[in-house]
């Protein structure tokens, strides 16, 4: 292309602010300058240094090719190295820092920032003389970001505190929030959790800094540290502030969409050929700023997507911490929804058991039965089978007694509605008792040597005594059928049961039942192994057999 045409096209592109398309023309000027002594390419560069990084960034914005960021950073550093006194040197160093951070070259970026903030160099003095406080604040922010990313807590401690001081002076809440998030993470990682608490009120504000992935992971770890020390209330504060990986992903996905939409709207204005140069320059700076925000948001999203989900661990920690602080209802619902929303999790058995046990703690019988039945229905779950069956049986027993009491209270009712209610309560009571005995019998048949066998025998004995169904107790425990003992029936005649811990209880309850029905001689062989003495004609205190409520209380205990 002829030199005159080349310069004309280049001037036209530069005037329109289209620096990206102007870059090939500069390359051609370099080639032309090798043969034409009238073309001084170096003077062209010195006269318009901002064109080159701006052109590279426009190319990056169009293609998202990160090599353009690298080229932009290299140009800025090279130019300032040659011309440190150039009027645009500070601006170019600031741009170099921005590009290096976009390219995630944190060590190189922080060196540039430290150079700009060094009181011994002219750069800082010039910035302060010109009163560019916002530029200084951005430098402090950049330095903090670099040390935070590098996890350099020694230098970071100074950088974070200085950023917080400067941000507070400028009343910049976003930058102050970021400084606080950095300090919080530093204190947790270095196990100085107590120093986090003065910062907590400021961490509750909705800013991008709150959605930093590492900050939230460390908040959870800080809560774990406090929980291990028994400081449950303080741990709950950190757990409450922790964002999950999914929340971080959603936030940055929405943020990327918002920034992209804003860039698209801005690009429409940038295409207007009639914009004044000053206005065009302002819009291009804003577009570059949005490009950096977009790159940062995408970087955060990438980190969140690579981070293994810790939602389950967080929810478990919250629920168990509620339990430790005796907030039992919150603990129950925490465990309950943890299981319900992820029933296929490899830890589902632990989830459902925790929810089941919590339901029993708060005496939520309906949920206790619901969860217990679901646990027992899964034949692969064996870890807590004994505990669940024991608690379930007791829950059915209590509910059956409750329904029986309702039915008894309405026996003399006259209204049809009350009579129907009494009938339903009676039927419910019978169904609950039926399920209670099924669980007890199944457990004792399967594992008569288990420590819980005593509980099942005592619970059944309690029910039989309250209902005065001694014949049924004797048939089940001692093998009495129609008043005649059968050596092939009854728990006490089962060798496996006889060797287990529940044998004394079964003998005692069977013996007392025989006494209650007037069969004193038949009761003696059953009671003798328990008291250790066999005395013929053993006198019984008056009222021992008649006061059944007293016997029932003993059995319950």
Describe the function of each predicted region:
Residues 1-557:
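Acidic, polar-rich low-complexity tracts and alpha-helical solenoid repeat scaffolds
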